[in-house]
Amino acid sequence: MSGQGREGTAIQGRSLWQIAWGRLKRDRVALAGGGVVVGLMLVAIFAPVIVAVLGHPPLEFHYDKIDPDLQVPRGHFGGISPDFLFGAEPVNGRDVFSRVVYGSRISLLIAFLATLLSVLLGTVAGVIAGYFGGWIDTLISRTMDVFLAFPLLLFAIALAGVVPDRAFGLAGDTLRIALMVFIIGFFSWPYIGRIIRGQALSLREREFIDAARSLGARSPRILFTEMLPNLAAPILIYSTLLIPTNILFEAALSFLSVGVRPPTPTWGGMLSEATHWFQIAPNFMLFPGLAIFITVLAFNLFGDGLRDALDPRSR
């Protein structure tokens, strides 16, 4: 009767991912966060379509919406109307809704690419340090300590100030996006690296690693075919939790005029411009601020739920 049910049907086991999905489906808060994340991605992807239907081009001026004496939008609460769902910017009358929608593209693109870079660097460094140990582990761990102690914000401001308008065959927004991805990703990899190193230290003592060694498997094969698949869950969890941190960092850099430059819309850049007008045009600051808040909250809720689903012991 082993392996058979009462009616003779075979009992099928469930994989880690099936079990995790079952747990995640029961977590309504995480599902809500995941739904918002998916919605934000769709907004970023289809920004031109959304703006064409509901707004105006993000760089288009609308001086007819501006009071010529006060230089602020006509009407209540920053000129909110059916044509301008989030109101208009002071001075030039650009559509705040369109700029918030297009700003999601920059924020999410930089956050995802920077997270990908940091995960690649951190995973490779963490696996090598945890598997080999000894002086290799010491060297990589001390390198992580140096990066973690580095004043990242000051470095970003200094580097962005000396980078020319054209470099490495890139220019304009493309160059600034690449610069932000490099700065954020290159200096945040130790956070992932430390976590993966700890997991690798535990895995290298497991029986399947000893079995692979006894069968003559070389270190690269053990690293990439035995250890990495077993590290997929923590990599996915902490990547999801790193994305909102990178969104905040990109917004901070744009707020300080270090990131993508105007007139290209970014959430942090809009907040920076809004500091001069928040008393008389609060919508200019409110909506990009809400966009950052909702995005970061959604990613954190989904990441926490994903962590609980894949590793219930972390609760």
Regions found by a protein language model. Give the residues of each.
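Generic hydrophobic transmembrane alpha-helix motif, especially the helices
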Residues: 84-86, 117-122, 130-131, 136-201, ...
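Short alpha-helical transmembrane interface motifs in multi-pass membrane proteins
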Residues: 106-110, 125, 141, 178-182, ...
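Gly/Trp-centered helix-boundary motif
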Residues: 1-119, 123, 127-128, 135, ...
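Residue-level hotspots within pore-lining transmembrane alpha-helices
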Residues: 105, 147, 151, 186-190, ...
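Transmembrane alpha-helical segments in multi-pass inner-membrane proteins
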Residues: 161, 165-167, 172-175, 179, ...
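Transmembrane helix-loop junction
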Residues: 52, 130-131, 161-165, 198, ...
